[in-house]
Amino acid sequence: MDSVEKGAATSVSNPRGRPSRGRPPKLQRNSRGGQGRGVEKPPHMAALILARGGSKGIPLKNIKHLAGVPLIGWVLRAALDSGVFQSIWVSTDHDEIENVAKQFGAQVHRRSSEASKDSSTSLDAIIEFLNYHNEVDIVGNIQATSPCLHPTDLQKVAEMIREEGYDSVFSVVRRHQFRWGEIQKGVREMTEPLNLNPAKRPRRQDWDGELYENGSFYFAKRHLIEMGYLQGGKMAYYEMRAEHSVDIDVDIDWPIAEQRVLRYGYFGKEKLKEIKLFVCNIDGCLTNGHIYVSGDQKEIISYDVKDAIGISLLKKSGIEVRLISERACSKQTLSSLKLDCKMEVNVPDKLAVVDEWRKEMGLCWKEVAYLGNEVSDEECLKKVGLSGVPADACAAAQKAVGYICKSSGGRGALREFAEHIFLLMEKVINSCQK
């Protein structure tokens, strides 16, 4: 279970390196409505994700795909599904980030060049946002680089502020790490332990550990932020589970975060169902979309052996695999691939055919996975339980999808999407066993 710890603090530290301005002030809380004005309007709580385009560690990391989803999409999904925010915003200076944010249902605040410098702090960007949005009373600054955030965490923090009267709440994680004093090079001094007695090293189970900021979020009321603080007043921390405390800063963090998010990430309100039917568009997914013609006018196509293995693995796991195409492909050519899959070609309405297959097998849409790449696949991608596209799919298909492969069509995308399905199905099985 998530645990929530609360405590007073005597100093302020900024999440992104702004120097402390001394002891945080004791704040007098007030309401905008005042007395004698009828029912007091509830304070406006806004989620704010800061996502400038000039990331130095990983270029455009905020929209780089993590486990098939733009990085910023993970926290936007959690914020939207938490149901505690009156508005959800992304503050950015970049057109591509703006487009992705809007696709996920967020509003966009175009950050000024002054607040987008390398030297600008999170606090600078938040204050600028508040200057343009007088309706906002509380800001939940959620870090885009924390993809394992869950709605329940945000719901509990909102309750701490709205119901328990805290001015600021920030996220922490418990760590069991021994710290030692740093020694300058060339100085002959011995290091000293900072949080342990080496003669009596405790076992992990005998030590409570220490709390560290994990950077997932910082909630604060407007009047506190306007005084130059994100942490202060009546202040509390919120302890997150260790498996949900993921922060991405440099390239080496990426593959580790990807495995963590697949295992512990939040995938939406609707529970995942076990996939029973996998449908793949032929041209541009199974194949690379190229058509070759032999001297005797026979059609020749190519595909990746890895994708054939992916189909075999899907079948072995009990998933029915079927192929579809809007083009009048040569069934003789396709049968020569020896994939042993039912297929339909020259299909003007793919959704109707997939719906017929689904009903034939007695399945709901959540039990169907679809890999497509064209405009003609868009409706199927929106309808199924799990949807994927190759890296080179058209823009319309990418917007409709849940997972974007790193591989291109005909070059391993099918195998990659199959492995993604296996990971998610493991998650379904584990949740059923709990």
Curated annotation (Swiss-Prot):
Record key words, sorted: Acetylation, Methylation, Nucleotidyltransferase, Nucleus, Transferase
Subcellular location: Nucleus
Residues modified to Omega-N-methylarginine: R37, R52
Ranges spanned by the short sequence motif BC2 motif, renumbered to the chain: 200-206
Modified residues (N-acetylmethionine): M1
Molecular function terms from GO: keto-deoxynonulosonic acid (KDN) cytidylyltransferase activity; N-acylneuraminate cytidylyltransferase activity; N-glycolylneuraminic acid (Neu5Gc) cytidylyltransferase activity
UniProt xrefs under CDD domains: CMP-NeuAc_Synthase
Entry superkingdom: Eukaryota
Active-site residues (renumbered): R201
UniProt motif (BC1 motif) ranges: 15-31
Record's catalysed reaction(s): an N-acylneuraminate + CTP = a CMP-N-acyl-beta-neuraminate + diphosphate
Motif interval(s): BC3 motif: 269-276
Location of the region described as Disordered in the Swiss-Prot/TrEMBL record: 1-42
EC annotation from Swiss-Prot or TrEMBL: 2.7.7.43
GO biological process, one term: N-acetylneuraminate metabolic process
Pfam families: CTP_transf_3
UniProt binding sites for substrate: R52, N62, R111, S120, S122, Q143
Stored InterPro entries: CMP-NeuNAc_synthase, Cytidylyl_trans, HAD-like_sf, HAD_sf, Nucleotide-diphossugar_trans
Biochemical pathway: Amino-sugar metabolism; N-acetylneuraminate metabolism
Function: Catalyzes the activation of N-acetylneuraminic acid (NeuNAc) to cytidine 5'-monophosphate N-acetylneuraminic acid (CMP-NeuNAc), a substrate required for the addition of sialic acid. Has some activity toward NeuNAc, N-glycolylneuraminic acid (Neu5Gc) or 2-keto-3-deoxy-D-glycero-D-galacto-nononic acid (KDN).
Similarity comment text for this entry: Belongs to the CMP-NeuNAc synthase family.
Domain notes: The BC2 (basic cluster 2) motif is necessary and sufficient for the nuclear localization and contains the catalytic active site. The localization in the nucleus is however not required for the enzyme activity.
Name assigned to this protein: N-acylneuraminate cytidylyltransferase
Lineage of producing organism: Eukaryota, Metazoa, Chordata, Craniata, Vertebrata
